[in-house]
From Swiss-Prot:
This is Mating-type-like protein A1. The keyword DNA-binding applies. Residues 141-200 bind DNA. Induction: Moderately repressed by HBR1 in response to hemoglobin and growth signals. GO terms for biological process: negative regulation of conjugation with cellular fusion; negative regulation of transcription by RNA polymerase II; phenotypic switching; regulation of phenotypic switching. The lineage of its organism: Eukaryota, Fungi, Dikarya, Ascomycota, Saccharomycotina. Coiled coil: none annotated. One of its GO terms (cellular component) is nucleus. Belongs to the MATA1 family. Pfam families: Homeodomain. It is found in: Nucleus. It comes from the Eukaryota.
Length: 210
């Protein structure tokens, strides 16, 4: 008998950590309170099976403790707090089951190149005259050189909108992704920047002549 009481008291202590004590039911019959709680919960049950099992097992064991210990043990449970516990549990289960929306492979690759990769880069910025490379690199690039296809150009345009002067590591990633040489990528960005500057220069010279 004593071991059953000790075991039930241990359960009671663990339940009390989850449910705030109150004096609402202090002078009422404990067993009737638990039965009423169980009936109401069964009538309004929309929770997950695991949550329901925890709820009913806890009440059943507390009822057993009530019959053993009688008036020596006071049960003070708040129905609202017990329901709030179940609601919090359900919300947590729903949040854990949430699936994040997926993004397209192209968008993900673009974000990776223009933002995340920059954390691993050197602080040095390549200047525009960086286009001159060593003789060996020129020879290698000529052997492997191929024309940029439309899909590669479209991707470079997207990158250029976000970053007009990518560093060396970013250009290497782009070249590797599309199977072209590093020098082709560097030339493309240099030419693109120059073309962007030309209209401004022409507009400035025409305004000066007038």
């Amino acid at each position: 008998m004593n071991s059953e009481i000790e075991s039930s008291l241990t359960l009671l202590k663990s339940v009390e950590k989850l449910v705030q004590a109150t004096s609402v039911y202090k002078n009422e019959d404990n067993e009737e309170i638990f039965l009423q709680l169980k009936r109401e919960r069964q009538e309004n049950s929309n929770s997950h099976e695991e949550t329901e099992t925890l709820f009913h097992e806890s009440l059943d064991r507390l009822m057993k403790l009530s019959s053993i210990a009688g008036s020596k043990v006071q049960y003070e449970l708040s129905l609202n707090n017990l329901y709030n516990l179940l609601l919090r549990t359900r919300k947590q289960e729903e949040e854990e089951a949430f699936i994040f929306p997926t993004v397209s492979t192209e968008e993900f690759a673009l974000e990776q190149i223009t933002f995340e990769v920059s954390d691993q880069m050197d602080d040095d910025k390549d200047s525009e005259d960086d286009i001159l490379i060593k003789g060996e690199e020129i020879k290698k690039s000529k052997k492997k050189r191929q024309r940029l296809d439309n899909s590669t150009k479209e991707f470079l345009e997207k990158v250029f909108e976000k970053n007009k002067q990518p560093n060396r590591r970013e250009r290497e990633l782009i070249a590797e992704k599309h199977g072209v040489s590093l020098s082709q990528i560097r030339v493309w960005f240099t030419n693109k920047r120059m073309r962007k500057k030309e209209p401004k220069s022409k507009a400035k010279s025409s305004s000066n002549s007038t």
